[in-house]
Amino acid sequence: IGRLVGSEMCIRDRYIIPTPIGNLRDITYRAIEILKKSDFILCEDTRISRKLMEKFDIKSKLLPNHKFNEKKNLSLFINHLRNDKIISLISDAGTPGISDPGAILVRECVEEKINIFPLPGPSAVSTAVCISGFSEKYFFYGFFPSKMKDIKNDLKFLTQLNSSIVFFISPKKVN
């Protein structure tokens, strides 16, 4: 995991920066500061991220990093880090790498011994758990598969757990 020297960022560092879920004003001052100092910001959807950048006058270059190009761009991103560039990873909402792109790049950074510094912030999982009334153990599942057969198989497994279960459903699928 990454580090700070004094209050300055280290070169060749990569930051995982949670973004607001719903209300742009929920972002932290520290997140804004690091985003402004980043050479590149890897984001899921540049159209969505641009709204956040404009709101807080962040001029760093946005590079798309989504499930369709994440593997293809991996060597480019690692090369930027090797050239002492500061890269921040954000998602459209919440914490990157949790049911969002980012895990592939994190794994590669760990293998390459490139510092990773996660910032605390919004997480849909912790937000859901804190208002559920179940404060003890829980199991985070992620998104359900798209095929009903796979959903049924997964539900068989999940019903065997002795804990609360948190899962995501796309807003497009909720009716």
Q: Where are each of the predicted segments found?
A:
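Glycine-rich, highly charged phosphate/nucleotide-binding loops
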Residues: 69-77
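Beta-strand/loop-alpha-helix module characteristic of Rossmann-like adenine-cofactor folds
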Residues: 126-175
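A short beta-strand/loop micro-motif in the catalytic core of glycosyltransferases
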Residues: 39-45
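Conserved helicase motor
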Residues: 65-70, 144-147
